[in-house]
Amino acid sequence: MITVRISFEKKNEASYISLLDMQRVMQRILKRSGLPVWHTLGFNPHIYMTFACPLSLGQESECECVDVKTEAEQPDFEHWKTALNAIMPAGIVVTKVAPVEMKADLIAYACYEISYPAAEAEKLMQYNALESVPVEKKSKRNTKTVELKEHVPALELTEAGERVQFEILSLIHISEP
């Protein structure tokens, strides 16, 4: 049994598909495709899959990943890509299918590109000058202070007409002591 990573992009109206709905979409697409995927055992067997770093509702993406176990010994990755793209809903395109090189929970960094009105550029640039940005992180049980600069060291701005775009390379997993 091999674990396969399906990379896909989500654009336009597909960006409003939530994680739970995306799981349903992938389950249905994989069933319709007839590809040899592994199902869990038990009373309610379903396709076992793991999403790496899912985005919030309304966010477009150029690369999201889902890991799926296959029953095939040597899967034809190009066939998987073609079969999945043939039945994907509008706005979702499979860009790559490949064997997993690292587990989804080991992916530690993500790059986000965000657009803001150009009038806000000055405020965004002030972030880079700050030495410390303490942020309160709330959970169900408690609240703790996290240093944001450790996870988002700097913002890189580019002007795009009336808007300014900035890229964030951020640490996703915050290690707990």
Kindly give the residue locations of the regions a language model identified:
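Residue-level detector of conserved catalytic or cofactor/ligand-binding positions
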Residues: 172-177
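Short, charge-patterned binding micro-sites
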Residues: 38-69, 101
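Ordered, amphipathic secondary-structure segments that act as subunit-interaction surfaces
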Residues: 61-113
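Long, contiguous binding/interaction regions
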Residues: 47, 130-153, 159
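The conserved catalytic core of RNA pseudouridine synthases
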Residues: 152-170
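Short beta-strand-to-loop capping motifs
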Residues: 8-10, 68-74, 114-119, 168-170
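Extended, well-folded interaction surfaces typified by the phenylalanyl-tRNA synthetase beta subunit core
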Residues: 2, 7-9, 13, 17, ...
